[in-house]
UniProtKB/Swiss-Prot annotation:
Listed InterPro entries: Asp_carbamoyltransf_reg_N (IPR020545), Asp_carbamoylTrfase_reg (IPR002801), Asp_carbamoyltrfase_reg_C (IPR020542), Asp_carbatrfase_reg_C_sf (IPR036792), Asp_carbatrfase_reg_N_sf (IPR036793)
Binding partners and assembly: Contains catalytic and regulatory chains.
Cofactor: Zn(2+)
Protein name: Aspartate carbamoyltransferase regulatory chain
Family: Belongs to the PyrI family.
GO cellular component: aspartate carbamoyltransferase complex
Organism: Vibrio vulnificus (strain YJ016)
Organismal lineage: Bacteria, Pseudomonadati, Pseudomonadota, Gammaproteobacteria, Vibrionales
GO biological process: 'de novo' pyrimidine nucleobase biosynthetic process; pyrimidine nucleotide biosynthetic process
Length: 153
């Protein structure tokens, strides 16, 4: 693609840009941060061309800045995403994504027999890596699930 035919997504003055989200994951990230209910302008790019990923998703959220805790939750969905905080059209901070040790009240336990489905308790998982794969262990039923299984729900 040359510069004349390349489409660009409009820059934002202030807010957060989440780039390099794997294709088909952008909508999940949007819901994770409840951005779909925001009164702020949200720009969504789905299945955009990417030399590194083939296709990628992109989110730009005006006047909203995600914090380190939110970035660690994002790492479960998109471990290689980049998060840039923008002020006056300039990148002022890049957040490093690191897996959290624990994640609570974000995901539903895939085990249909888990107590979290029938009792008013928040889900709670311990997050760890095993042979390069991210796994989550439910605090209540103690079952271990791959990241993909837990985040697809």
């Amino acid at each position: 693609m040359n510069k004349e035919t390349k489409l660009q997504v409009e820059a934002i003055k202030n807010g957060t840009v989440i780039d390099h989200i794997p294709a088909q994951v952008g909508i999940k990230v949007l819901k994770l941060f409840d951005m779909h209910n925001s009164s702020q302008r949200v720009t969504i790019g789905l299945n955009l061309p990417s030399s590194a990923l083939g296709n990628k998703d992109l989110l730009k959220i005006e006047n909203v800045f995600i914090n380190e805790e939110q970035a660690s939750k994002l790492a479960l969905y998109a471990p290689h995403a980049t998060v840039n905080q923008i002020e006056d059209y300039q990148v002022v901070k890049k957040l490093a994504l690191e897996l959290p040790e624990f994640v609570s009240d974000v995901f539903e336990c895939p085990n249909s027999n888990c107590i979290t489905h029938n009792e008013p308790v928040a889900s709670n998982f311990r997050v760890f890596e095993k042979k390069g794969d991210v796994r989550l262990k439910c605090k209540y039923c103690e079952k271990v699930f791959s990241r993909e299984i837990v985040t697809e729900r």
